[in-house]
Design a protein with these regions (language model features):
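Acidic loop->beta-strand submotif enriched in PP2C/PPM serine/threonine phosphatases
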Residues: 1-10, 64-67, 99-141, 173
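Short strand-connecting beta-turns/loops that link adjacent beta-strands
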Residues: 6-8, 74-76, 188
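Short glycine-aspartate micro-motif
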Residues: 12-13, 81
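Active-site-proximal, acidic helix/loop segment immediately C-terminal to a metal-coordinating Asp/Glu
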Residues: 19-41, 126-175, 188
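A short, polar/proline- and glycine-enriched secondary-structure boundary/capping micro-motif
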Residues: 22-26, 91-94, 109-114, 140-142
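Catalytic core of PPM/PP2C metal-dependent serine/threonine phosphatase domains
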Residues: 25-94, 168-176, 183
């Protein structure tokens, strides 16, 4: 996971390498670093996706990673959710919850990389939740989502992330890597 600011944008990245263990963690970390550095250098999203995809395709292992990116325009409040094989994200606005999902494949899975982009105009107080598949498995009806929607998790981003992780680990049969990132919009 990375967050960074570049000129007029704030970025949040969550990459989740396919599989488990050290190799998957390394693929995730390398992909996030590629995205961060290339975007910071001014490369277009398409160029960065193509570069990371080519890099992963040319590794000796079958490497691929999901990409869940939030690109928030600091000038106009528009937020692009860019997804490649990523789990659904949530936007919490007051008592409303919006799910942003994708059917695209992970980066490094095929020769051509495809992504889906959803643009949302955010408001102060909105919260964005990005999660990995270790948390999202069976998102509908999951205990952490029920706890979140019933208001039984702490409202601050750090507390909410900790509560989601704790609830997601409850009753887990086989541990999978689990990542959650909660962002709150303070002003637009």
């Amino acid at each position: 996971m990375y967050t960074f600011k570049d000129q007029d944008y704030f970025y949040a990245l969550l990459c989740d390498g396919m599989g488990s263990g050290r190799e998957a963690a390394l693929v995730s970390r390398i992909a996030c670093q590629f995205f961060k550095h290339l975007l910071s250098c001014g490369a277009s999203l398409e160029t960065v996706l193509g570069t990371v995809n080519d890099f992963l395709l040319h590794q000796s292992c079958e490497c691929s990673t999901t990409l869940d990116m939030v690109r928030f325009d600091l000038l106009d409040g528009q937020c692009d959710f860019i997804k490649c094989g990523a789990c659904p994200s949530l936007v919490l606005r007051g008592d409303n919850t919006f799910k942003i999902s994708s059917t695209s494949l992970p980066v490094g899975a095929t020769r051509e990389v495809h992504y889906e982009k959803v643009t949302v105009r955010l408001r102060p107080g909105d919260k964005i939740i990005l999660i990995s598949d270790g948390i999202s498995s069976q998102i509908e009806g999951s205990p952490w989502l029920s706890a979140l929607l019933s208001g039984s998790v702490r409202p601050d981003p750090q507390g909410m992330a900790e509560d989601i992780l704790r609830t997601a680990f409850t009753g887990a049969e086989k541990p999978d890597d689990r990542s959650v990132l909660v962002l709150e919009v303070s002003e637009c």
